[in-house]
């Protein structure tokens, strides 16, 4: 775990000047040519760098359309895995939401991008040679971000792009940064002129036999925070070179009796995958625990202007040892400890997305 500060300097107004270099999204167009205007060809997303992870039975693929740019990222678990879904905020974009999945599809394109998940479903049916027995049904749940504000087209992830992301899926690799569903993700949308591009991020932790993989596409109203309290992405003032916590903008607006400004069209979508067996109650609480923890790295989070979804997935491969007194009612201390560790892995993933 890297806890090194990102050279943060707090000024008296609450702004935080930081390094990395700014990556402004620019004012939105909210329109432009759509899918039919282009001869769209899915591209395998490579991103800024590749995370290598050791999680047998889990593959990840990312694809995008350069013309968007927008994309889709698929987490494929051929054997299937139990899933809990935690969705919060005012504008959730979700399909499926099943408690057992063979794939999770994350995509751009707002509600239109849910079509990518249908492409994943169709491709999995083809792999079954169109067998449709109930026990063989391939389940896919999808979540989307609203990424039109960071680009000038109406291109969205369609069935072909979802299918391509699945075809590109390989074990043990995840493209970090501007790739897949994170191609046009952005953060810090108090004002469009201060919005910055993010991306998709992942982090992996192995502790003995325990494996945890976190995947996230942060596209929030809020800014991205590091563990030292520095703002590493979002709400960047190009004139002053300062990234500023939105709370100071809101405080000033209320003090001057003005309506606070916040832009609509925001979502953070994520998945936390482990091999630890949990009861349904524990898995649901695990999802809530990790999702709630993300407010440390994204501030504000779960707002009325956001639509945040987290998928908690377990492959049910190992049981953690129990100790006397480790259970209280239906909840286990083991699941609580796992959630605490997974929360740190997810924060690492958020920071990777912001690099």
Swiss-Prot record:
Keyword Metal-binding in record: no
GO molecular function, one term: aminopeptidase activity
Pathway the protein acts in: Xenobiotic degradation; nylon-6 oligomer degradation
Top EC category: hydrolase
Entry's pH dependence statement: Optimum pH is 7.0-8.5.
Documented EC number(s): 3.5.1.117
Stored InterPro entries: ArgJ-like_dom_sf, Peptidase_S58_DmpA
Listed GO biological process terms: nylon catabolic process
Superkingdom of origin organism: Bacteria
Post-translational modification: Expressed as an inactive precursor that is cleaved autocatalytically at Asn266/Thr267 to generate an active enzyme composed of an alpha subunit and a beta subunit.
Function: Involved in the degradation of nylon-6 oligomers. Degrades cyclic and linear oligomers of 6-aminohexanoate (Ahx) with a degree of polymerization greater than three by an endo-type mode. Cannot use Ahx cyclic dimer or the Ahx linear dimer.
Subunit structure: Heterotetramer composed of 4 alpha/beta heterodimers.
Name of the molecule in the record: 6-aminohexanoate-oligomer endohydrolase
Organism name: Kocuria sp. (strain KY2)
Classification lineage: Bacteria, Bacillati, Actinomycetota, Actinomycetes, Micrococcales
